Structures are given as structure tokens and as C-alpha cells.
């Protein structure tokens, strides 16, 4: 029946696309990890609400993107397992009275297993929903990276230079370097999510078994697959060619009182006062000084300590310099590089910890690559066996005809 044949062909096509997409995702992961490895000492401002928050490193931030993509790879791997199931032999939906061997066709076509219930086999499209859901998640992660590239390449941020092959000019403005490719990735994330919503809406409330509505599902699948694979490929090239403006990045870590959290932490560690109290003191200090100090590390630590003492007297009735806080500790708290070194807990931005993560992620990446390759080779062996079976049958038919 066309019902089980079409379902089988869609699954074969999709499993091939999933295997190809997994390769591209791993290329992008490797590009991010390598770019991080080149910049473990590159200081950058970290943001919350797009406001200066705490200092981190470029490597730490790009490893965050790589980790998100590692989860995307895992989801694609799971989607492959649910896709690579064989519906062939289900016929229209009630199977057949002929003595077919469904297990044999399942094996020869490279499927992991068969969809046993013949009605489920022809009417289910949940594997498509799952796959496009994975694509949507992946594209959402790519859109965050794309948005970052777009922002960081603006004149206002000016942190990076996007490779020339991924920007376009203007028909009338000679100076323009528009990050069009990143913008298209950002936009296509919405398109892929739209494909998911369309397929969910089509499949909702469909009665068993087959309905022609399902014909409308496949175009959304192919569009989502094409957009996702192309976006990953383009992003890989863009990441590889990014040029960092390290001086500008580091300069941005010196403004906006980005060391405020570490100063509050230092006060707590040195004096044992409650963090809420330290937070209140440093918050007041930030309100007074954030517009005056263009370079935090140039601020005189003795001046900062005196002002902290004044604020502490108003808040708790004692000077913090009398209960453990020193000028040296204040100076160290205001030092951005020192801030980073202290954050050496698991997953933190300290160099030693980031290098450990990079090493571990490379190992994970190699392992994931092997997992994908095993699946691809299994399919190839099955199809080779199928080709041999067909060749053998042809010889038998030829002999019988003679």
C-alpha cells in the first residue's frame, strides 16, 4: 500500500538527514570549543538584562554555547532512534494476508526495529513532530548565538569583526557591513518553530488510521530540515572566522562597577557581616560612583575603603576596616583578573576550570561522533546486504527465464 510505503520512505529520508545534521552540529561544536581554547585569557563583560553584571572570559561564554549544542546533539540522537523504525508491511493499516517477512525487510532496510502495530505504523507522525521539535530547539540556540554576533559587531559594542564572506554592503551606504547571515539564522529560527506549530496543528485530533491531512506534514518537515542544516553550516563558518577585538572587550570589563559582586563577597569573607548588609553598602557605593569612575582598577583602593567605612558606620555603626577589611583586599576585589581566578569552582570561568571543561568536551565530542558513525555504518551494512540480495534474486530470475 502507498500508506506504509510512503511512511517508510519518509523515515528513510529523515534518518539520513538526521545523520547529516548531527555531523554539522559536531562541526559547530568543535569550532566553538576551538575558539574558546584560543581565548581562555580573554576577559569580557558578562551581562544580565543586557546590563554589565560580572566579568567572565570569552572561553567561558563560548563553552556555554557548545554545551547547549551538545544537548541538541543528544536530542537528535534520540529522534533518530524513534525515526529509524520500520512501518513496511503494515499495508493500508490492517496488514496483509500474504506471508510476508516484516523482520527481514526491517533488517535489509537498515531499521533498528519495526513498528509492530500495523495501524500505528501507517498513521503515526510523532517522529516528525519530535524531529522538528529538536530542530526548533537547535535553531533557538543558534538564534541566541546569532543575536550575540549581531550585537557584538555593532558600533556600540564593537567587540568582534564578522568575516567578510558573512556580511553584505549597502546599495547607498559605502561603510556598511551588515551581518545578514546571522540575521537570517535568527529569522529562520522563527520559521522552523512555525513548521513545528503547523505540524502539531495538522496532527491534532486526527482519527485513526490514515488521513490525507498527513500529506501536508511532509513539506514542513523538509523545510525545517533544510533551514536547520544550512543554518548550522553557515554558523560554523562564521564562528571560525570571527575576529575578537580583545582590547575593547577588556576595556569594557573596567566600567559599570562590574567587580561589585566580588567586592561584596570580599566584605563578607573579611568581616563576617551578613551578605545583605554588604550588598546594601556596595549598592550605595555603586550609585555614588558608577558614573564617575571610568576605570574601576584606577580607582584608589584607600579612597574606596574610606567610603565603605563611612557607609558601614551609617548602616551598622562600625567601620569595616576595624573588623577585617583591608586596603589590599579591596584592591584585589576590584581587580578583574583576580575576580576570574577566584571563580575556580566546577563550571566557573577560572582558566584552570575552563581548560578542564574544554578537554572534557573534546572527549565528549569524539564519543558523540563515534555514536553517530556506528548508526551510519549499521545502515550501510544493511543496504549493502539488500543490494546483494537483489543481485542474487536477479540471477535466479535470469536463470529461470533461460
Regions from the language model: what does each represent?
Residues 1-86, 95, 100-102, 106, ...:
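A helix-coil-helix interface module used to build multimeric assemblies
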Residues 173-402:
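Glycine-rich cofactor/substrate-binding loops
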Residues 42, 46, 79-85, 152-156, ...:
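Flexible, glycine/charged-enriched surface loops at secondary-structure junctions
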Amino acid at each position: 500500500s502507498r500508506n506504509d510505503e510512503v511512511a517508510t520512505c519518509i523515515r528513510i529520508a529523515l534518518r539520513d538527514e538526521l545523520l547529516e545534521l548531527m555531523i554539522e552540529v559536531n562541526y559547530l561544536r568543535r569550532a566553538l570549543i576551538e575558539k574558546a581554547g584560543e581565548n581562555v585569557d580573554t576577559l569580557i563583560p558578562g551581562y544580565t538584562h543586557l546590563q554589565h553584571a560580572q566579568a567572565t572570559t570569552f572561553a567561558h561564554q563560548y563553552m556555554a554555547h557548545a554545551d547547549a549544542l551538545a544537548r541538541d546533539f543528544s536530542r537528535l540522537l534520540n529522534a533518530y532512534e524513534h525515526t529509524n523504525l520500520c512501518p513496511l508491511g503494515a499495508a493500508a493499516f490492517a496488514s496483509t494476508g500474504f506471508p510476508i517477512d516484516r523482520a527481514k525487510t526491517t533488517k535489509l532496510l537498515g531499521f533498528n526495529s519495526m513498528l509492530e502495530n500495523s495501524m500505528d505504523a501507517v498513521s503515526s507522525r510523532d517522529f516528525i513532530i519530535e524531529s522538528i521539535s529538536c530542530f526548533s530547539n537547535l535553531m533557538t540556540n543558534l538564534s541566541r548565538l546569532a543575536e550575540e554576533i549581531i550585537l557584538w559587531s555593532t558600533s556600540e559594542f564593537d567587540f568582534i569583526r564578522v568575516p567578510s564572506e558573512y556580511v553584505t554592503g549597502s546599495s547607498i551606504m559605502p561603510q556598511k557591513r551588515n551581518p545578514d547571515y546571522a540575521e537570517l539564522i535568527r529569522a529562520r529560527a522563527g520559521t522552523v518553530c512555525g513548521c513545528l506549530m503547523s505540524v502539531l496543528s495538522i496532527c491534532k485530533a486526527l482519527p485513526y488510521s490514515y488521513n490525507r491531512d498527513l500529506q501536508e506534514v511532509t513539506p514542513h518537515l523538509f523545510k525545517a530540515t533544510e533551514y536547520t542544516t544550512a543554518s548550522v553550516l553557515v554558523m560554523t563558518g562564521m564562528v571560525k572566522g570571527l575576529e575578537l577585538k580583545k582590547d575593547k572587550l577588556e576595556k569594557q570589563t573596567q566600567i559599570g562597577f562590574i567587580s561589585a559582586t566580588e567586592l561584596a563577597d570580599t566584605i563578607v569573607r573579611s568581616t563576617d557581616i551578613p551578605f545583605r548588609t554588604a550588598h546594601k553598602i556596595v549598592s550605595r557605593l555603586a550609585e555614588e560612583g558608577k558614573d564617575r569612575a571610568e576605570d574601576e582598577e584606577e580607582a584608589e583602593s584607600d579612597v574606596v575603603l574610606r567610603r565603605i567605612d563611612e557607609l558601614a558606620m551609617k548602616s551598622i555603626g562600625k567601620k569595616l576596616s576595624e573588623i577585617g577589611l583591608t586596603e589590599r583586599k579591596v584592591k584585589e576585589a576590584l581587580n578583574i583578573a583576580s575576580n576570574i581566578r577566584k571563580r575556580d569552582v566546577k563550571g566557573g570561568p577560572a582558566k584552570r576550570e575552563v581548560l578542564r571543561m574544554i578537554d572534557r568536551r573534546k572527549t565528549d565530542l569524539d564519543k558523540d561522533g563515534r555514536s553517530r558513525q556506528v548508526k551510519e555504518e549499521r545502515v550501510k551494512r544493511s543496504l549493502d546486504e539488500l543490494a546483494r540480495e537483489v543481485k542474487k534474486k536477479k540471477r535466479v530470475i535470469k536463470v529461470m527465464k533461460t
